[in-house]
From Swiss-Prot:
Belongs to the CobT family. GO terms for biological process: cobalamin biosynthetic process. This is Nicotinate-nucleotide--dimethylbenzimidazole phosphoribosyltransferase. The lineage of its organism: Bacteria, Bacillati, Chloroflexota, Chloroflexia, Chloroflexales. The keyword Glycosyltransferase applies. It is an enzyme of class 2 (transferase). It comes from Roseiflexus castenholzii (strain DSM 13941 / HLO8). Pfam families: DBI_PRT. Catalyzes the synthesis of alpha-ribazole-5'-phosphate from nicotinate mononucleotide (NAMN) and 5,6-dimethylbenzimidazole (DMB).
Length: 353
């Protein structure tokens, strides 16, 4: 049995007893029922995920998958491909936005080279799982082989398992890859059936001509390859990216180990579509951090029946939104665990009648 198949079979359902107990405790804490809104429902979801009635999330980590895209050569991005490798080094040196926000909440940043088109120097904080020097240009040929697609997902699973084995109890997804909004839009269009123009945005800031070119390239690729929306590996093979597959694996690995996973922006959303097409049972384990500026993100939420925690007009990626989302998860669980009940505090409850 492959690692992918084994992982999918290990994904269960939410622990209803733990969730019910968490909700019962929320209802007697010193506040009107429901007064903390999503923080309350978030804590109950996390109780169901972990099977703990009062979960404590003390060891967060964000897994940042980095890879390049052959389709970037078609002029679909505002930045050159070498920025991918340059930003990976920035991550490793602690100078990127993701590093700042991760330090803010005490989260570890795990950087994975799953397909950067450069030979990166060895570094103690870099995990080298390179599947190739970027994907192929999917406007003229499949982005990768089916074997590579499965490998990408399994690399993500293994990275999640390793992080959890080291004590991580809350995971987030992050990405780096010039051209990856193009691949993500192609994945989203393929799986949801939405028109390409409806799910394709400006990425890192392309102009009108660049956006028109990006849409045309994706439409050309979908017409050429006809990816099967019911077969996630087929979609990943034909129009995906190595980091998208890797992040799908992180999601599946976290779900199989009953660890909450906070998904970042549009690229992580495309990965979530891959993951949940492979294993629909993974959906309840997902926590959507933010609504990205990328126009296709709402199609992801609609398809997966997810509601993001916040909308701050963000579009950076890297896991920045997901790390902010992890801080809300921690806050929600601390409310559930540390607040006093009406009985404990000697506070009168709601007058009935």
């Amino acid at each position: 049995m492959s690692l992918l198949t084994d992982t999918i079979t290990r994904i269960g359902s939410l622990d209803s007893a733990a969730a019910t107990a968490a909700q019962a405790r929320q209802d007697v804490l010193t506040k009107p029922q429901g007064a903390l809104g999503r923080l309350e429902t978030l804590s109950v979801q996390i109780a169901g995920i972990t099977g703990q009635t009062r979960p404590r999330l003390n060891n967060p980590a964000v897994i940042v998958m980095a890879a390049d895209h052959g389709v970037a050569r078609r002029g679909v991005s505002a930045y050159p491909s070498e920025v991918t490798s340059q930003m990976v080094l920035n991550f490793l040196n602690g100078g990127a936005a993701i590093n700042v926000l991760a330090r803010h909440i005490g989260a570890r940043v795990i950087v994975v080279d799953i397909g950067v088109a450069a030979n990166l120097p060895s570094h103690s904080e870099l995990i080298d799982r390179k599947l190739g020097m970027g994907t192929a240009d999917f406007s003229v040929e499949p982005a990768m082989s089916r074997a590579q697609a499965q490998q990408a997902v399994e690399i993500g699973i293994a990275c999640a398992y390793d992080a959890i084995a080291s004590g991580v109890d809350l995971l987030a997804t992050g990405d780096m890859g010039i051209g990856n909004t193009t691949a993500s839009s192609a994945v989203v269009a393929a799986i949801t059936g939405r028109p390409v123009a409806e799910v394709t945005g400006r990425g890192a800031g392309i102009d009108d001509a660049g956006l028109a070119r990006k849409i045309a390239v994706i439409e050309q690729a979908l017409a050429l390859h006809h990816p099967d929306p019911r077969d996630a590996l087929d979609v990943l093979t034909k129009v995906g990216g190595f980091e998208i597959g890797g992040l799908a694996g992180v999601i599946l690995g976290a779900a199989a180990r009953r660890v909450p996973v906070v998904i970042d922006g549009f690229i992580s959303g495309a990965a979530a579509l891959i993951a949940c097409t492979l294993a629909p049972s993974a959906q309840p384990f997902l926590i959507a951090a933010l609504r990205s500026v990328e126009r296709g993100h709402d199609a992801v939420f609609a398809h997966l029946d997810l509601t993001p925690l916040f909308d701050l007009g963000m579009r950076l990626g890297e896991g920045t939104g997901a790390v902010l989302g992890m801080s809300l998860c921690q806050a929600a669980c601390k409310i559930l665990d540390e607040m006093a009940t009406f009985g404990e505090a000697g506070v009168s409850g709601k007058v009935e009648g």
